Amino acid sequence: MKVLIIADIGNRLKIEKYISSYKKFFHYLDSVEVSFFEKKYTDLAEFDCIVVDEYNLNEAVCLYRGIYNYDNLFLWFEGALICVSDADLLKSMSNKAVKAKNWSLAKKINSIRIDLNRIMKKAVIDTYPSQLQLESTSFCNAQCIMCSHYYAGNKGALDMNQRMLDKLSELLPYLDIVIMHGNGEPFTSKLFSESVEVYSSYGIGLTTNTNLSILTDDHIRLINQSFVNIRVSCDACTREIYEGIRRRLSFDNFVKNAIRLRDLCPDVSKTMASVLMRQNIEQLPEMVAFAAEYGFDEIIFSNLGVSLIVGNEKDNISNYPYLASKQLKKAIDMGSKCGIKVTIPSSFDLSLDDELICGEEIEIIHSMPFFRREEEILAIRDFAESVVGDEYRIVENLSDCFWEENLFECEGICEWCIEKPYIDLNGDVFVCCINASYRVGNIFDYDSFLDLWNNDTYKRIRTLFYNGKLPGFCDNCQFILNGSLKKLSVPSPSKDFYQRRHISKFYHDYCEANADE
């Protein structure tokens, strides 16, 4: 019998020794010939058995798409060989780990099983998420001009509660990471400290996005104790633009807290998150230097989410492609000088270079006021109330919307639909935070999270990905554009991909009703 071992050097000898010494494993064979993986092997047909360690599983699948069809495919895990087709064994190991409160082993097994489900393209999965984005509060002390709080304030806002924590206890043993933000400022949550302590008791690493307007000594303690990353929202490096974008916040207070975070939490990774818009496009390189000065490891620039309610289409810097190209290139160069990573969306053509057109675009940008007058904001709020009523946003069932036709090609599957859901404080579950208007289900409507995790909508989403089709709600996805998705790619997307698709049933019905008038 010929066996191919695909493993790290340290595991190769362990696996070979295991095979040679554990006679029961190949008791029916006279001899076993072991080979180690080399790039020259392009055809696996000559091997009767393949052994892959946990660290090379994903690479093996990338190299050999059909590897999961092998009857004799084994996983080297925790010092033993496990037949990949024997799903019950890993499940049993997981149950024992949870019972023993061995959280690290439970998480490790769950992650392996997630990979195996993905490799075997299972639409129905028996694993829990390894990451969870869970809203801590939907209250916010700011009214940023690109956010629903701009027109809705804290209408309909909720705070974390014990009922929610109890309902999610089913997931906690398996989670590696909890992302503690949603549509509010997490450091205003009344149960922030208690939530952190609960998550930490299960060995869960934490991260969150904050506007950094609040940073108490207790926050500092919790960040150092339990957080692997802090992501800070900041869209300008001057007082006028910062306070114009992030209404109700103080630039001086932000700088003070950024210094405290830098000096008192030196070992925690820090990321600055900035939304690209007309108002800040001229200071992008300065923002990179600003982020570096205050101890950030990375600055991520994201595209503006255009809102029909706010009417901010002209704030989108895609309207100013030559200036965007110039400023983004300067920002990247500044990152190299300052030693900070700069991440930008892939939707911009950085080859554009024309100073005359840049000047014309700057004139257009400054021909409109950067910020609205109070009476204009009140008019937006009145319009929003006429559209969404008492809620701060419209939430629809994804199953009622339009996202399964005329789709772009893709390779792989988005991790959000197999290991990383987003849950708000109503208990509504969404595919991701970008699509937080389209509900897949509600945790309080199901006895077990796994029942929701495998409802008809989730199965349809996974099946589309496995068939090489990108669901319609993924068009112009920020995670695809900034390259943060590890298991999904959209090769050579057309220009149409960079336009957000209107999948909303409410939007379709609204347009039809107005067309009839």
Q: Each predicted region: which residue ranges?
A:
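Extreme N-terminal starter segment of soluble prokaryotic enzymes
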Residues: 1-3
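Structural motif
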Residues: 5-11, 52-57, 76-80
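A short, well-structured beta->alpha microelement
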Residues: 21-44
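Ser/Thr/Gly-rich flexible loops in soluble cytosolic domains mediating phosphotransfer, phosphorylation
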Residues: 62-101
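N-terminal pre-core extensions flanking Radical SAM catalytic domains
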Residues: 85-152, 169-173, 347-408, 418-420, ...
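Conserved alpha-helical substructure of the radical SAM core
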Residues: 108-229, 240-256, 263, 286, ...
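Conserved C-terminal portion of the radical SAM core fold
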Residues: 173-181, 200-207, 226-234, 252-400, ...
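A short acidic/small-residue loop/turn micro-motif
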Residues: 436-439
